[in-house]
Amino acid sequence: MIQPGAIVIVHLVNPTEKFFGVLQDLAVAGVTFRGINLSSFDDWMAQAVRPGDQTLGLSTVFVPLFRVERIFLDEPAGSVKSYSQRFAQVVGREVHEYLENPGGTPVL
């Protein structure tokens, strides 16, 4: 079962959207997560490398369950890296660590 705090990919319908983020709550009424549209992920990741240039960020969003098509854990698939792994490789910090302290120094 996917638990709050997990890094997830949320697929929505009407309109179709995909988000990367941290699951906060999954309930009968819907899903709450702190995330960013996947179309902005690479820009957000590039911005995380330059801490003084913060124009993109994750937003806390509630989506009614009728819009949720599926929720995936952000996991690697064979040789394809997860979004979290890509983030850590480019930024030098884990996603959870970055979200707790965006201006901190890289750990790598």
What annotation goes with each model-predicted range?
Residues 1-108:
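Conserved RNA-binding domains used in RNP assembly and mRNA/RNA metabolism
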